[in-house]
Amino acid sequence: MALKDVLIDELRDMYSAENQLVKALPKLAKGAKNAKLKQLFSAHLEETKGQVERLKKVFLELGEKPTGQHCNGMEGVIEEGKDALEKDEEGASFDSGIIGAALRTEHYEIAGYEACISMATTLGMAKIVKLLNSNLKEELAAAKKITVAGGPIMKQSAAEPEAPKKPKTGKEKYSAMKSKEDEVKAAPSILDRLAS
C-alpha cells in the first residue's frame, strides 16, 4: 500500500470521526450542567461542521470519495462520553466526567490530523496540508478552551464531599471484568509476581 493510500484511509477515518461528533456534541451540550461548557460544546459543533466541509474539499482535491470507512476509535471515545453522561453524579463532579470525555475526543482528533498532515506534507500536497492545518488549529484551540473552562469546575468538584459508594451497575461490572482481562493479557508475568 502506497503512502497516498494510507493517507486516504486516515482521512476517511477522520471524516467518519467528525461526522460522529456532529451527532454527539449536541448531547454533550445538553447534558453539561455548567453554562460555559454548554456554550463551548455548542460552538465546537459549528466548528466541527466546518471541519467536515474542509474534509470534503480535501477529498475533492484527491479525486476520492470521503465515505467508506467507519472510525471505531472515535466510536469508542464517544461511548465513554455517553458513559459520563449516564453517571449518577451531580454538579461539578458530573461536569468533570464530561470534561475528561471531551478532552479525550479532542486529543484523538489532534493525533489524527497530525498524522494526516505529516503524510500530506511528505507527499507534497500543500493545499491539503493547509485545509488540514485549519482543522488541527481548531481542535487545539477547542482542547485549550475545555481545559481552561474545566479548571474551576474541577476545583469545585474536588471540594465536593465524596458520595457514598453505590452498588455497581451491570455495565460497570462488565467494564471491571474486561479491565481485569486486559490486565491479564497485557502483563501476566508482572501480575503473577505481584500476587506471590
Residue ranges of each PLM-predicted region?
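Amphipathic alpha-helical hairpins
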Residues: 1-196
